[in-house]
């Protein structure tokens, strides 16, 4: 199962992006049987990251939020918490003061002009995640926390207690 998270400046923008993806799922452009899409506010994503409950495979986010917050800082936190997460910046405009390459992401595109590219990129990511390449990461759930580890960095696992 591939989990996609969407976070935007406001609920209307988030709903629009979710609707765009879901409409393509109905048209069989995106595999609907193995995909779940969830919408978020910036605050709910931050809470999930703080509580170690963030476990999305693909995360689509805006670059410019209110109160001086930005998607690059959010992406950096996601990179640390969930290194296997594929981040897509889907934005109204790319601010000159932001360096989007400070964080690891797979694509950056403008809303409206690149809607088709968002659907195509998301579809390709889903296909890649469903293949064997995605097996390089494991999710460990303990209590209510989720930890995502890169298998190549694990030397051994010791179980205590």
Place the predicted regions along the sequence by residue.
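Short helix-capping segments at alpha-helix termini
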Residues: 25-31, 81-82
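A generic structural signal for alpha->beta connector loops
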Residues: 1, 32-33, 84, 105
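Acidic, metal-coordinating helix/loop segments flanking the phosphotransfer/catalytic sites
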Residues: 18-19, 34-57
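Conserved acidic segment of CheY-like receiver
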Residues: 2-22
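Hydrophobic alpha-helices of bacterial signal-transduction systems
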Residues: 16, 21-23, 37, 89-91
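Conserved binding/recognition cores within well-folded domains
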Residues: 120-161
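CheY-like receiver
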Residues: 51-132
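Hydrophobic/aromatic residues located in beta-strands of well-ordered beta-sheets
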Residues: 4, 35-36, 87
């Amino acid at each position: 199962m591939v989990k996609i998270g969407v976070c935007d400046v406001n609920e209307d923008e988030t709903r629009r992006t979710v609707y765009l993806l879901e409409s393509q799922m109905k048209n069989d452009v995106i595999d609907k049987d193995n995909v779940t899409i969830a919408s978020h506010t910036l605050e709910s994503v931050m809470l999930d990251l703080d509580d170690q409950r963030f476990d999305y495979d693909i995360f689509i986010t805006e670059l410019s939020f209110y109160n001086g917050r930005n998607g690059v800082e959010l992406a950096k936190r996601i990179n640390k918490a969930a290194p296997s997460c594929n981040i897509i910046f889907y934005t109204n405009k790319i601010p000159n003061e932001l360096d989007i390459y400070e964080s690891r992401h797979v694509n950056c595109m403008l809303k409206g002009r690149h809607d088709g590219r968002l659907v195509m990129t998301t579809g390709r990511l889903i296909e890649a995640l469903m293949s064997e390449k995605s097996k390089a990461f494991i999710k460990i759930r303990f209590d209510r926390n989720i930890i995502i580890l890169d298998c190549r960095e694990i030397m051994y696992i010791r179980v205590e207690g």
